[in-house]
Amino acid sequence: KPQTKELMHLCMRQEAYLEALSHLQSPLDPSTLLAEVCVEQCTFMDSKMKPLWIMYSNEEAGSGGSVGIIFKNGDDLRQDMLTLQMIQLMDVLWKQEGLDLRMTPYGCLPTGDRTGLIEVVLRSDTIANIQLNKSNMAATAAFNKDALLNWLKSKNPGWVSGPGIGSLSFPRGVEWEGLACQN
């Protein structure tokens, strides 16, 4: 609701809040310094628990980018963190074997059994949105197995049909033998 968002912005503009929330090390990545809250970019996310999307200007010299953190209250992020740690581990192992799937596992830090922080991955989208946008029928979007493949192809025009995992196609010139999965 616009009124709720404006009240949140009004609260965050108070000097005490700006001072407390500025010039911090990111709890998700201590090597990242969070300069100042970009109040106008902060919002509530459109989901049941209304997570708070907080955007910061990045204090890193010359980076000039923004850093986002989602604060969630009411969700248990401990399983999310474990899953993401397993994905990070698999990504490292795959890269050691020469397989770079270009993954960006985001940071997740439970701060309690029902609260926590999640790293915002800029210029990304959810699988649900991809399925909805790349499917012909919204009612069956979640069951459309081609939606994700069509999205991958639209983002990677150099990819061609060939051997791969399931029906996924891979870039030309990459050795993918031995990676096919049994269905």
Predicted segments with their positions:
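Eukaryotic intrinsically disordered, low-complexity, charge-rich
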Residues: 2-7
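Conserved ATP-binding subdomain of kinase catalytic cores across diverse folds
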Residues: 8-181
